[in-house]
Curated annotation (Swiss-Prot):
Ligand binding (substrate): 139-140, 282, 291, 300
Co-factor note (free text): Binds 1 divalent metal cation per subunit. Can use ions such as Zn(2+), Mg(2+) or Co(2+).
Cofactor(s) listed in the protein's UniProt record: Zn(2+); Mg(2+); Co(2+)
Highest taxon of source: Bacteria
Molecular-function annotations in GO: 4-hydroxythreonine-4-phosphate dehydrogenase activity; cobalt ion binding; magnesium ion binding; NAD binding; zinc ion binding
Subunit structure: Homodimer.
Reactions mediated catalytically: 4-(phosphooxy)-L-threonine + NAD(+) = 3-amino-2-oxopropyl phosphate + CO2 + NADH
Record's miscellaneous remark: The active site is located at the dimer interface.
Listed name of the protein: 4-hydroxythreonine-4-phosphate dehydrogenase
Length: 342
């Protein structure tokens, strides 16, 4: 059982990126920003080395998940990994891949065992992982694999970008724009919307979520004159969702979907492709947008940026998005717990 004293698990990400230093910076700002307790899954020597490079003093205590919340007020709790890292900021090394993956594995296991209220992931880079034999497209797909392996639940992970004023969900994600019309199906839209509505209700505490469904084509196709996908694929999905009692409406023209008055009318916007979802989310909340993975049997958030190898180790990386991810993970965990007890 996840109690109020159960800390969040934070995986360190690629140690050559900014993950270690934004974790340090977030911890040092914990009192000023009201940060919930977390423990870092990492190599303690890496964190000490990075703090030294940055010229900052951070107290570190090696601990267990059960004791992390008690430690957090006085020191950065680190649950040590078996792997050891090479501290090479800005220079990714496949030798660090095993530890990067171990941190993710242990965060998932902690969530499923009740040893973490939720997991937050610092950014990873695909190439050093691929060079070491990792064969998953990215974080999200690997998390779905782990969820199935640990719990027997086949998960369909759904990506959400959540900011203070907007939540967006891309139905198709990391594929070329030219491939989107072929990948987009009524069934995929319906499945994505169902998961979004369920998590908005269960974890975000929104009793009757309102889903705005964006059209694929300019002006949502203008009745078929600018493409048939909105009439033949998107609109049938909306009809199915409404028949199921989900408050979905659309297809809506994307060019007028994200201004303030429009945003007041929905709780999340389902977008048909990656940039349709991420451009408005990052424009409105570049520093504090959070990536939330819906549809998993545990809560996972992450900062909405990458490893930033170009600035790693220079002391200029901002922890804002990680702080937002930690806070949102705590909120979602608390809401999920209340919903489960109701």
């Amino acid at each position: 059982m996840k109690s109020a004293m159960t800390a969040l698990a934070l995986s360190v990400g690629d140690p050559s990126g900014i993950g270690p230093e934004i974790a340090i910076a977030a911890f040092l700002a914990r009192e000023a920003v009201g940060l919930p307790a977390f423990y870092l899954l990492a190599d303690p020597a890496l964190i000490a080395s990075r703090a030294s490079r940055l010229g900052v003093s951070v107290p570190i205590v090696e601990t267990t998940p059960a004791l992390a919340a008690q430690v957090f007020a006085r020191a950065l709790p680190i649950v040590p990994l078996a792997a050891r890292f090479i501290d090479s900021p800005g220079r990714p090394d496949p030798a660090n891949a095993a530890g990067t993956v171990e941190a993710i594995d242990r965060a998932v296991a902690a969530c499923l065992a009740g040893d973490a209220a939720a997991m937050v992931t610092c950014p990873i880079a695909k190439k050093p992982l691929y060079d070491a034999g990792f064969r998953f497209p990215g974080h999200t797909e690997y998390l779905a694999h782990l969820a199935a392996r640990h719990s027997g639940v086949e998960a369909m992970p759904v990506m959400m970008l959540a900011g203070p004023d907007l939540r967006t969900v891309p139905v198709t994600i990391h594929i070329a724009l030219a491939e989107v019309p072929k990948a987009l199906t009524t069934e995929l839209i319906v499945a994505t919307a169902r998961i979004t509505a369920a998590d908005l209700a269960g974890r975000f505490g929104i009793a009757r979520p309102r889903l705005a469904i964006a059209g694929l084509n300019p002006h949502a196709g203008e009745g078929g004159s600018l493409g048939l996908e909105d009439e033949h694929i998107v609109r049938p999905a909306v009809d199915i969702l409404r028949a199921e009692g989900i408050d979905a409406f659309g297809p809506l023209a994307a060019d007028t979907l994200f201004h303030a008055r429009a945003r007041a009318g929905y709780d999340a916007a389902l977008c048909m492709y990656h940039d349709q979802a991420l451009i408005p989310a990052k424009t409105l909340a570049f520093d504090d947008a959070v990536n939330v993975t819906l549809g998993l049997p545990f809560i996972r958030t992450s900062p909405d940026h990458g490893t930033a190898f170009d600035i790693a180790g220079k002391g200029i990386a901002r922890p804002d998005s990680l702080i937002a991810a930690l806070k949102l993970a705590r909120t979602l965990a608390d809401t999920d717990k209340k919903a489960a007890a109701a």
